[in-house]
């Protein structure tokens, strides 16, 4: 309510991001997304709502365990079943879902996003990818991702049929003003890609 009272009249206030990030059907998340999304829509006259869950795959970083692989990767059939159930329960309250792409292996990303897109069409929810611009394959947490890995993820998302892409996190990992030297090169490669380079 406070955010709406302060900023709701600004033209830049175009919708809501529900910040609860989950990867699976857990913690009464259907009720949380349903109630929060419904509240935000009613408060703002129907402005769109979005969530950005992660794919709980082999690359998922668990700060409470040693190593990157948390040892609890979701299978594709379980992902499909759980997200169908979640989407069925939040239809009309959540308009778009941007799946964080860093949790699963590159070879599995297209399959997970394809399943998500199919479920999204079934339930009337727009599916996007949330491209993580940092590298999970390095012993240091976290450095800007190599361009060829980002391109691989963008192409997998395109093949899966996502509606669009968002990114986490531009200012640290891809900005030409970032303190990470690697971010400057990543930004140049991405600009070249947008201009039609690298044979989209």
Where are these predicted regions, by residue range?
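Glycan-processing catalytic domains of CAZymes
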Residues: 1-200
